[in-house]
Amino acid sequence: MPPTVRQGIRTVGTLRVTRPSSYVLSSREFSVLNRPPPNYPGHIPLTTIERGALAVGSAIGSLLNPRRADLIAALGEATATPYFIYRLRDAMLSNPTGRRILRDRPRISSKTLSVEYLRSLPPNSVGRTYVNWLDREGVGPDSRETVRYIDDEECAYVMQRYRECHDFYHAVTGLPIVVEGEVALKTFEFANTLLPMTGLSMFAVMRLKPEERERYWELHLPWAVRSGLASKEVINVYWEEELERDVNELREKLGIEKPPDLREIRKMMRRQKKAAEAAREKYQN
């Protein structure tokens, strides 16, 4: 047998041996009565029917109540496979910083990020901007759900990383956690990551007030599409190494355009509404 043929056979054999466990799991039929063992701590293998039911149920539930973070997390996991989470993982593998993140497996939590250290950073630094945003919104870095329904262990980490970095995206864009702000940020994330859950979250526009919907269509949707497509893939940002950098410098480096301050817009609209009501009452009296 020619050497090139032997080498080709060895290569194919290696590829077969090193197929990810998720491929083996997804290609092997099972039922709720003979569920395979988990691929990582906390992993729950799902049948195709179970995954579909989880996607539909969590989509309906999160649309009815956009504040249910657990349902949004389940929707993200149920719809990320078989293609989208692998595309995001491959985007990390094709980037030097993304590869380091996959190798190091950093986690973002109150145990890994010192709030006191973040508050000691210069006012316009990434870390200070992040902790100021956490304080203003009344949230913390430990509020993210743990990934359970993605079969491949490495892809599960990619989803966990995306989830734990979400508040950094909030901080650098300045968008608050009100539904209007979340929909705007999810639209940006969809343009940047292509994760289906981020796109499906746009249906929450239907739950916005008329003036909020108008702002979304005229202001936030164009910004999100423009900035999300033009910027570098945010999954490849090693946030732990960017904490001391000037936040404006980081935005410029990533190509992220900061949207108008939504909190200030909402405050201004409330003031105008109160002034109009007071003027109307004065006129009627």
Swiss-Prot record:
InterPro entries: Coq4 (IPR007715), Coq4_euk (IPR027540). Its main location: mitochondrion. One of its GO terms (biological process) is ubiquinone biosynthetic process. It is an enzyme of class 4 (lyase). It is a peripheral membrane protein. The keyword Flavoprotein does not apply. Keywords: Lyase, Membrane, Metal-binding, Mitochondrion, Mitochondrion inner membrane, Transit peptide, Ubiquinone biosynthesis, Zinc. Belongs to the COQ4 family. HAMAP family: Coq4. This is Ubiquinone biosynthesis protein COQ4, mitochondrial.
